[in-house]
UniProtKB/Swiss-Prot annotation:
GO terms for molecular function: calcium channel regulator activity; ion channel inhibitor activity; toxin activity. It holds the Pfam family Conotoxin. Disulfide bonds join C48-C62, C55-C66, C61-C73. This is Omega-conotoxin-like PuIIA. The presence of a 'disulfide through disulfide knot' structurally defines this protein as a knottin. Residues 1-22 form the signal peptide. It comes from the Eukaryota. It comes from Conus pulicarius (Flea-bitten cone). Expressed by the venom duct.
Amino acid sequence: MKLTCVVIVAVLFLTACQLITAETYSRGEQKHRALSSTDKNSKLTRTCNTPTQYCTLHRHCCSLYCHKTIHACA
């Protein structure tokens, strides 16, 4: 009888642990999805320099090419 009670308590404890872990994981996953969506939106709305505008890096230009010598977008 005591062994049966111990086994039942152990099963209930392990089930509760799994449910808590699953709930925490799903919440974290949802937060991650929200951040991912925000990141995608920021990439879609980024501004870039048009040709002949000043640049220092390729990513500043809409064409993704910056002339190193004249520091202008292609």
